[in-house]
């Protein structure tokens, strides 16, 4: 049975990832401050991910218990801009990522998937995107401390994979994560389309995001790869043509947008 450490396994996306991985035969160990649901089937290790000593000890402890972990899924972070002061967002998120990835590499892990973010694309798009649908081809445009850290993580992954050609690091630029209970709010978005223009009306169901994590883990890719992860539609019932005409009339449109197709290109994924 393949063994994976999941950081942030008690969060919205993390819970779905743990469930998905356990269901598909992975042996899951969760590193987090908060325990995942007791019925998750995962082993829980309470930990402060900003403390490298704790992280390394836990990772090597997993190695001692299980021979070694086979993979790492890193989801733990301050989850969005504005939750805490900027300096805390920066210090927490960059140190957690470095600590977890560094400890995993020390334990011999070469299969790493981590949560990047759609915010790297220039959200909240106060400066309009260069074209729509947005994709992975244009350089990152971080507009917040949160997205700046995600940009640095992507750059770090590229260099770590250059150092070790056997290392795989896949960054998933998740859109706004939704759970089933969140769908009740979708009809209200039509009354105020401006409230969702910040991410081009995109979203990702936590269960679909979890599937993306599993498929990334199980892929035979090497090196670093970045993917936008969003659902195939928008949160709106208004057609894309109307939304673009109202909010982004001067932005280049590439291809057929469809009536409700996502404006966060998932073609690469």
Regions found by a protein language model. Give the residues of each.
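N-terminal Rossmann NAD(P)H-binding glycine-rich loop of SDR-like oxidoreductase domains
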Residues: 4-24
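NAD(P)H-binding glycine-rich loop region in Rossmannoid oxidoreductase-like domains
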Residues: 49-92
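NAD(P)-cofactor binding segment of oxidoreductase domains
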Residues: 65-67, 84-113
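Catalytic helix-loop patch of NAD(P)-dependent Rossmann-fold dehydrogenases
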Residues: 91, 126-165
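Conserved Rossmann-fold NAD(P)-dependent oxidoreductase catalytic core, especially the SDR/UDP-sugar
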Residues: 99-143
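Flexible, glycine-rich beta-alpha linker
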Residues: 122, 145, 162-187
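Alpha-helical substrate-binding/gating segment
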Residues: 177-193, 199-226
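C-terminal substrate-binding subdomain of Rossmann-fold SDR/epimerase-dehydratase oxidoreductases
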Residues: 207-269
């Amino acid at each position: 049975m393949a063994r994976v450490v999941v950081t942030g396994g008690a969060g919205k996306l993390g819970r779905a990832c743990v469930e998905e991985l356990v269901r598909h035969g992975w042996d899951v160990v969760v590193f987090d401050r908060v325990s995942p649901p007791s019925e998750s089937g995962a082993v829980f290790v309470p930990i402060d991910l900003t403390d490298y000593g704790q992280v390394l000890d836990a990772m090597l402890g997993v190695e001692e218990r299980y021979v070694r972990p086979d993979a790492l899924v890193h989801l733990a972070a301050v989850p969005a801009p504005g939750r805490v002061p900027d300096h805390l967002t920066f210090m927490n998120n960059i140190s957690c990522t470095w600590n977890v990835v560094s400890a995993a590499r020390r334990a011999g892990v070469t299969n790493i998937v981590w949560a990047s973010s759609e915010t790297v694309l220039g959200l909240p798009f106060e400066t309009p995107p260069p074209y729509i649908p947005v994709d992975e081809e244009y350089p990152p445009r971080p507009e917040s401390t949160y997205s700046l850290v995600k940009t640095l993580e992507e750059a770090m992954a590229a260099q770590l994979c250059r150092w070790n050609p056997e290392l795989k690091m896949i960054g998933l630029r998740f859109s706004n994560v939704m759970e089933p209970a969140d769908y009740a709010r979708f009809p209200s978005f039509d009354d105020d389309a401006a409230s969702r223009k910040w991410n081009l009306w995109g979203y990702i169901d936590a269960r679909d995001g979890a599937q993306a994590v599993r498929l990334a883990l199980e892929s035979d890719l090497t090196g670093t790869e970045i993917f936008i992860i969003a659902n195939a539609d928008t949160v709106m019932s208004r057609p894309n043509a109307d939304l673009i005409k109202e909010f982004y009339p001067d932005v280049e449109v590439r291809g057929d947008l469809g009536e409700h197709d996502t404006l966060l290109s998932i073609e690469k994924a």
